């Protein structure tokens, strides 16, 4: 306890619920004692929580939040020091302080004995539940809502923690607490215990949370999918020497995928033309999405400027990025989401170009003999060797963004969907209701690997998944035995309510609009608490191919 929250054993119960949750959840994760929320078997196995627990947790959590809001409203000014002083004045519900005292009194209990200690385990479950109920909508509400003192404080603490945690006294290097969209409805893990708070351990992956509730988002979300490049040449793949000789010692090879950057004027014309053609299919467009390795850095800047002028988000893989520290080549994606129009009454986007978020790929692509033959690359890459992408693996981060009051999304790059460690724990803890996977892959058929891994995320935590590849790679992908035309299934959609859909571009079309809608469902925590049918599920709502324009596209 002292490691997570210095001074925990000598002071009173922390007033800020995410701090209390960080302590309780970390201890439950370390000991596995969260399983005691259920009667799991045996002649005398009894749940530590009775049938009145859901209502009691909601009432006490609500009282805790009201106490904090009252203290902040009466005593807080602006800034961290003022908030600290106000939180110290909050009068916490007796049930919260009693559970905290029980926990502190048993601080000497060994990890191996925790689960068998009824009083200790009950206090952990209660503190977690109270903090979760007190933190409804954390990270999911506008920071500018003057009527929500709790939400304003949460946003300030998030900013002070560099977008890594909503905690106040718990340092992000000890435990991180973020918001949450989905609660797993199968299995029993620590993630099953909360609706609103997620524990992210400060290990390999750094999660970052952005709340853009001021952005205007309708109940229908229209994404323009640009499966660029439309043509991929075999000569775009080249063997390279790493300089270290490590790959050669293992009997492997390295390759890079590259192509010349296109003129600025052409890129601007292509993106503008695609947006204009898409708006003939739908009246409103919210985002433009391109696959892995779709744009160079210079092309991104032009496309980003067009997106900002057009009031749409832009998400794309970058082909020629480099690591800031080492200068080595890096496979990454960039996300510009500040370009969305703001809702009435919200602050407008600044006149200067807003910064885009960059996320690096966490795993390298490996082409084996089967894939070299499948993509007809045998004249460029040695099919007898494993060919690894020449890409630097540096700091691992994952980005979560909340938009428009209901959408929380994150982005993965190809192998990061399939090789889910070490990112899976963070992704499942937060449970975004949309995951966008940018791929450099063959056709997105329901029988192939992207669909399998999308199904895993749809099951736990319940995320909807979009996978998108380039038409060029689809066309290069052929059965190894020969024969068959290249596929035009450039994307795949999976949600937990309505299943899987392949998105195929008809001949004569070079883009499509995917329409998504918000559906609501009720989810329960493992300790029996309902969210009141407040869970928002992103579901398929339509698919509209965009006929090719007269301009020569990439």
Q: Where do the protein language model's features map onto the residues?
A:
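Active-site regions of metal-assisted phosphoester/phosphodiester hydrolases
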Residues: 174, 179-201, 361-387, 398-400, ...
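Acidic Ser/Thr/Pro-rich low-complexity disordered segments
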Residues: 234-246, 342-354, 499-519, 523-526
